[in-house]
Amino acid sequence: MLRLEDLDIRKGSFCLSGTASIGAADSVAVIGPSGAGKSTLLEAIAGFQPLHAGQVLWRGEDLTAHRPGQRPVAMLFQDGNLFPHLTVRQNAGLGIDPNRKLRPKERQTVEEAIARVGLGGLEERKPAELSGGQQSRAALARVLVQRRDILLLDEPFAALGPALKAEMLDLVKEITSENGVTLLMVSHDPDDARRIADQVILIAEGQLYPPAPTHALLDNPPPALRGYLGA
């Protein structure tokens, strides 16, 4: 279980607080108004944003003092951050070793991840030679090779059209289900939450609300969510 215990996150005048528990292998969408702190929450879980107070715990272990690389977390950002001078294979390999000095078993892991995201045969292409959807798949492959227990998605597919975005969300859901990965995904689109998430965490007015079942929450939103949805 991922436990966010009495979190208190502060950045200048910004403040976010709350407590939440997320079961292992659960899929959770994080929604709320722009600027509410959705991305900041993911950064705190990953270790990029320090906490003013509180704890991040995974399976009972306190991760709060751990550096990002020491946490069982992989994160995919809005910009996939592919290196333009590197091939798909080389970009994916960065998820294992920034120096790309891979052992044979690690190289096999890279090949398997590339195939799993549907880029088999495109290993030697560079990002400029890929479509937007293929670039998203390459970035996802780099995350997969890390083989972490928690996957954080900060709207990595926001720039894709509806059909491609749905395709990527379905792929993520398949992969996380296959591997028992806990997923947290920031989204501005309630339809994305319905498509991929079992539960929703609402962030609004400085408050982190505990997870609630997706369809029940979106079909009968509380006041804090109603304004955001325009319901």
Curated annotation (Swiss-Prot):
Its EC number is 7.6.2.15. The keyword Hydrolase does not apply. GO terms for cellular component: plasma membrane. It is found in: Cell inner membrane. It catalyses: thiamine(out) + ATP + H2O = thiamine(in) + ADP + phosphate + H(+). Belongs to the ABC transporter superfamily. Thiamine importer (TC 3.A.1.19.1) family. The complex is composed of two ATP-binding proteins (ThiQ), two transmembrane proteins (ThiP) and a solute-binding protein (ThiB). Part of the ABC transporter complex ThiBPQ involved in thiamine import. Responsible for energy coupling to the transport system. This is Thiamine import ATP-binding protein ThiQ. The gene is thiQ.
